[in-house]
């Protein structure tokens, strides 16, 4: 009698095991999609298994898409900051690397801007040198020796100075369209 119960229990376990699809089987060998849609509707376990598999595939593909999208957005941001070079981008860049290996900082950029402003102011004033008044400049140029040993001529110095002033005045007074 015990053997009949044992055989019946074993038979019930086999039937119950055939109804359930273990997770290991579905992961190791993918199910073929040659079954028709009517077969899938008939077997609810099959529908749950395929649904779980498709959700996992979708989640995996979606996370890969999000990763590539984030990487693409980061590259676009980098390109825009390099292209625009606006104040926000300069604030984040401590140094800008040049091909010859030198670095320029925000301080040197500021100093270059200041030097440009001083040069424009110097052009507007029309002076020969930035640091010295006109009289001192003329005296220094008279005392300076050329490479061949002769002294600079006072007349040439004065004419050069006047020509420079006339040129700067012409630049300031004429419009850009008139210069062409």
Swiss-Prot record:
Compartmental location: Secreted
Listed GO MF terms: glucagon receptor binding; hormone activity
SMART domains linked to this entry: GLUCA
Site (Cleavage) location in chain: 52-53, 83-84, 91-92, 97-98, 130-131, 145-146
Tissue: Glucagon is secreted in the A cells of the islets of Langerhans. GLP-1, GLP-2, oxyntomodulin and glicentin are secreted from enteroendocrine cells throughout the gastrointestinal tract. GLP-1 and GLP-2 are also secreted in selected neurons in the brain.
Residues that make up the propeptide removed upon maturation: 84-89, 131-145
Maturation and modification: Proglucagon is post-translationally processed in a tissue-specific manner in pancreatic A cells and intestinal L cells. In pancreatic A cells, the major bioactive hormone is glucagon cleaved by PCSK2/PC2. In the intestinal L cells PCSK1/PC1 liberates GLP-1, GLP-2, glicentin and oxyntomodulin. GLP-1 is further N-terminally truncated by post-translational processing in the intestinal L cells resulting in GLP-1(7-37) GLP-1-(7-36)amide. The C-terminal amidation is neither important for the metabolism of GLP-1 nor for its effects on the endocrine pancreas.
Residues the record lists as Phosphoserine modifications: 54, 105, 108, 150, 152
Region named Disordered: 23-56
Induction text: Glucagon release is stimulated by hypoglycemia and inhibited by hyperglycemia, insulin, and somatostatin. GLP-1 and GLP-2 are induced in response to nutrient ingestion.
InterPro entries with a match to the protein in the record: Glucagon, Glucagon_GIP_secretin_VIP
Keywords, alphabetical: Amidation, Cleavage on pair of basic residues, Hormone, Phosphoprotein, Secreted, Signal
Superkingdom assignment: Eukaryota
Pfam families noted in UniProt: Hormone_2
Gene Ontology cellular-component terms listed: extracellular space
Chief location of this protein within or outside the cell: secreted
Signal peptide: 1-20
Protein name: Pro-glucagon
Annotated source species: Octodon degus (Degu)
Lineage: Eukaryota, Metazoa, Chordata, Craniata, Vertebrata
The encoding gene: GCG
């Amino acid at each position: 009698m015990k053997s009949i119960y044992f055989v019946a229990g074993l038979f019930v376990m086999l039937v119950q095991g055939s109804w359930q699809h273990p997770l290991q089987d579905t992961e190791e060998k993918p199910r073929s999609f040659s079954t028709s849609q009517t077969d899938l509707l008939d077997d609810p376990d099959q529908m749950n298994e395929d649904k779980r598999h498709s959700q996992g595939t979708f989640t995996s593909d979606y996370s890969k898409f999000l990763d590539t999208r984030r990487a693409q957005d980061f590259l676009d941001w980098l390109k825009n900051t390099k292209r625009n070079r606006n104040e926000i981008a300069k604030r984040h860049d401590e140094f800008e690397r040049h091909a010859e290996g030198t670095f320029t900082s925000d301080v040197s950029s500021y100093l270059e801007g200041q030097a440009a402003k001083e040069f424009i102011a110097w052009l507007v004033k029309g002076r020969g040198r930035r640091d010295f008044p006109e009289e001192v400049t003329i005296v220094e140029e008279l005392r300076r020796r050329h490479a061949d040993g002769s002294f600079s001529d006072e007349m040439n110095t004065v004419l050069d100075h006047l020509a420079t002033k006339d040129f700067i005045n012409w630049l300031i007074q004429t419009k850009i369209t008139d210069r062409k």
